[in-house]
Swiss-Prot record:
Topology within the bilayer: Lipid-anchor
Organism for this UniProt entry: Mycolicibacterium vanbaalenii (strain DSM 7251 / JCM 13017 / BCRC 16820 / KCTC 9966 / NRRL B-24157 / PYR-1) (Mycobacterium vanbaalenii)
Coiled coil: none
Biased composition (Pro residues): 37-47
Protein known as: Lipoprotein LpqB
Lipidation (N-palmitoyl cysteine): 19
Length: 585
């Protein structure tokens, strides 16, 4: 997994310690469905190629999906090309070994390889691990033009190195169910023409989110809306789209959205998708021949949709808080006084989080930690005010707040619960259906943290990182769906986690050499800096601008850029054994 361990951190600033490998700058598109020129770097078969070389070049050529993998089909006989089914997901493989059985005019080959991940026909990349199951024999025959593949298994196997060179990562954005922000949906695509990028991105927004997000987000660009024509420069020109000051013009048709807020969300989806992909504004957005919003007829900018900024830090004004000696304190310059009210006085607090606004607190009080008769309770109330007990159990995980101010926690290892305030003002405890998670990943859930957009839950289960969608069911309740593992390279060493942004998670671990790591939505993991940390490293709390961890001495903050050899610096007023960082989230 080291080959993919640092693929995603290039976009991070303070947190990046090195960049390599994963394609990071292209648009999503369905594999094998787009007619366009193949990238010039793809190999072609030659008469002098030996079977082994021809097979390796074939695996490289499969990296281009254009025209139903036309580049790869050049390596096949006509009969093999007519029967090869290249639809569906592709497996990304490395360390390929071919074992040949030769005859003068025919060669039979078995293939062994390591699986590094998969790429769906929507461009969704997920990391994987393990040996490639035997796909069946591959047969080559000698033709007048040299060796060609005459029989091969269905499906696509992508050479990892060629995948890196051909595919780029871009992020689509969809609206969260509350309409407060936008949700990332990373995709990978092979693209060679920069001026086609914006059109491909918008086309994929119209096509909709990946299956696991279908019931967790809203798509204001969904059917019957469609793209009228290619995205152009703001003035209608076809070259230089989104580069320099040329801007981008998007013409839509069949718009059914009439209320201003929904149109604002539609614009936010487009603008954040294009902007985060390096396609600069102004963004001229038209629907059915008229401006989407007359106020922005000359063009939108990111400032016009800043309220939905996916990189904004929730409750940033609240600042850093901490549990010190079991009570809640706030960082105030070089001091850390207890907060006023009950949370500053109540002893035995072992985990806490602030609401998204930073004005409310949810805190866990634990009696007799670790003992057979251990007891935990969840207390909720305004920061600086009184607290009310709303839930109890033997163990409760660190609380996490959703965008609708519900508090999520896990009771006694497996029972996920939402706590909300009902119409009478009393707390209501509502079970969350976590059956999909506990069936696939048995074991106690030691941590559950909701993403900043509230549509995903990241969990620590038996030391593994597990991601699931947060889906509201027809009856109004919630379920955790589509669980999958992230960060195979981390093994089973995770202790705590926190969302830094909607696309990446900070993880503390039991590994002294790499006590802090990062993992993104694709599942790619990378090691963070370890300088000045002492084991064990416990709770982590993060937001887009800061990462705090607790080690045996107290709370430390990640500081310095990648060029400055980043390390961990002490938060002096919070250097107390057992202190734990607390942020909104």
């Amino acid at each position: 997994m080291r080959r993919i361990a640092a693929l995603w951190l290039c976009a991070l600033m303070v947190f990046a310690v090195g960049c390599a490998g994963v394609p990071s700058s292209s648009s999503p598109q369905a594999i094998g469905t787009v007619d366009r020129p193949a990238p010039p770097s793809l190999p072609k078969p030659t008469p002098a190629m030996d079977p082994d070389v021809l097979l390796r070049e074939f695996l490289k050529a499969t990296a281009d999906p254009a025209n139903r993998h036309l580049a790869a089909r050049q390596f096949l006989t006509e009969s093999a090309s007519s029967t090869w089914d290249d639809a569906g997901s592709a497996l990304l493989i490395d360390n390929v070994v071919f074992v040949e059985t030769r005859a003068p005019e025919r060669v039979s080959v078995t293939m062994r390889a390591d699986i590094l991940g998969s790429l769906s026909d929507m461009g969704v990349f997920e990391t994987g691990a393990g040996a490639l199951p035997d796909p069946g024999p591959i047969e080559l025959v000698k033709t007048p033009d040299g060796w060609r593949i005459d029989r091969l298994p269905n499906g696509v196997f992508l050479d990892w190195q060629q995948f890196q060179a051909t595919y780029k990562r871009h992020t689509l954005y969809f609206a969260d169910p509350t309409g407060k922000t936008v949700v990332p949906d990373p995709r990978y695509v092979a693209v060679s023409e920069p001026d086609q990028l914006a059109t491909e991105l918008v086309s994929k927004l119209v096509a909709g989110p990946r299956p696991e997000m279908d019931k967790t987000v809203r798509n204001l660009l969904g059917s019957p809306l469609r793209l009228r024509g290619p995205v152009t420069r703001a003035d209608g020109g076809k070259t230089g789209v989104g580069r320099g000051y040329g801007g981008a013009r998007v013409d839509l048709e069949n718009l059914s959205t009439t209320d201003p807020h929904s149109r604002q969300l539609l614009a936010a989806q487009l603008i954040w998708t294009l902007s985060r992909s390096g396609i600069n504004g102004p963004y001229v957005l038209n629907a059915d021949g008229a401006a989407l919003d007359d106020r922005f007829a000359e063009g939108w900018d990111t400032a016009d949709v800043a309220a939905t900024d996916p990189g904004a830090a929730d409750g940033a004004a609240a600042g850093l808080h901490a549990l010190v000696g079991g009570s809640l304190v706030r960082l105030d310059g070089q001091r850390a006084p207890r907060v006023s009210g009950q949370f500053g006085q109540m002893p035995g607090q072992t985990a806490a989080s602030l609401s998204r606004t930073g004005q409310e607190v949810a805190s866990i009080v634990t009696l007799r930690p670790g003992a057979p008769d251990m007891a935990s309770s969840l207390w909720v109330g305004p920061l600086g005010g009184n607290a009310s007990q709303v839930l109890d159990g033997r163990s409760l995980t660190r609380p996490s707040w959703s965008l609708d101010d519900a508090i999520w926690t896990v009771v006694d290892g497996n029972n996920v619960v939402r706590v909300i305030q009902d119409a009478s003002g009393q707390p209501a405890r509502i079970p969350v259906d976590a059956s999909a998670v506990v069936t696939r990943f048995p074991g106690a859930i030691a941590e559950l943290q909701l993403s900043r957009d509230g549509t995903r839950a990241a969990m620590v289960i038996e030391g593994k990182i597990v991601l699931a969608g947060v889906e509201q069911t027809a009856g109004g309740n919630y379920a955790l769906t589509y669980p999958r593992r992230l960060g195979y390279g981390l093994g089973e060493t995770a202790v705590s986690l926190s969302w830094r942004t909607g696309d990446d998670i900070v993880v503390t671990r039991t590994v002294a050499q790499s006590p802090v790591s990062y993992v993104n939505l694709d599942g790619v993991n990378s090691d963070g800096p370890s300088r000045n940390l002492l084991m064990p490293v416990k709770t982590v709390a993060a937001n887009p601008s800061a990462v705090y961890v607790a080690d045996g001495r107290g709370i430390l903050q990640l500081s310095g850029s990648a060029a400055e050899d980043p390390g961990w610096s002490e938060v002096r007023p919070l250097m107390s054994a057992g202190a734990l960082p607390v942020l909104p989230g």
